[in-house]
């Protein structure tokens, strides 16, 4: 190997050239790679944070759903109890109302029965008085003849009873 040879110097020049170009390019490439690595790390951290936030939000939502289910169950249970109580109260009110109406109807029927009975008795008495009056008027009997007839009948009854004792 000869130091004066052109290919030798060309090779050394090329190596120096590559070294000189590579050195500043190396810094630029390393800086670009470091920037990309930092960006990727930030994105990974953001993704991890988003994942943690999503998991936390999922758990919170899950707890809220459980609370809502519990609340819904309680509301349904309370509404069932309230409905049953309302039904019982209204049934009791209806029964009391019907009992009052029944008692009122019975009382009304009894009042009407009493009124009708009294009316019939009054009508019957009026009719008897009218018939007796007509009878006495048609027979044209005076008070004396009525009294005489009654006396005669009572004497007849006394005579019959004496006659029965004698026999």
Curated annotation (Swiss-Prot):
One of its GO terms (cellular component) is proton-transporting ATP synthase complex. GO terms for molecular function: proton-transporting ATP synthase activity, rotational mechanism. It is found in: Cell inner membrane. Keywords: ATP synthesis, Cell inner membrane, Cell membrane, CF(0), Hydrogen ion transport, Ion transport, Membrane, Transmembrane, Transmembrane helix, Transport. It comes from the Bacteria. The chain crosses the membrane at residues 7-25. The keyword Cell inner membrane applies. It is a single-pass membrane protein. Coiled coil: none annotated. Pfam families: ATP-synt_B (PF00430). F(1)F(0) ATP synthase produces ATP from ADP in the presence of a proton or sodium gradient. F-type ATPases consist of two structural domains, F(1) containing the extramembraneous catalytic core and F(0) containing the membrane proton channel, linked together by a central stalk and a peripheral stalk. During catalysis, ATP synthesis in the catalytic domain of F(1) is coupled via a rotary mechanism of the central stalk subunits to proton translocation. Component of the F(0) channel, it forms part of the peripheral stalk, linking F(1) to F(0). F-type ATPases have 2 components, F(1) - the catalytic core - and F(0) - the membrane proton channel. F(1) has five subunits: alpha(3), beta(3), gamma(1), delta(1), epsilon(1). F(0) has three main subunits: a(1), b(2) and c(10-14). The alpha and beta chains form an alternating ring which encloses part of the gamma chain. F(1) is attached to F(0) by a central stalk formed by the gamma and epsilon chains, while a peripheral stalk is formed by the delta and b chains. NCBIfam families: PRK06568.1. Belongs to the ATPase B chain family. This is ATP synthase subunit b. It comes from Rickettsia prowazekii (strain Madrid E). The gene is atpF.
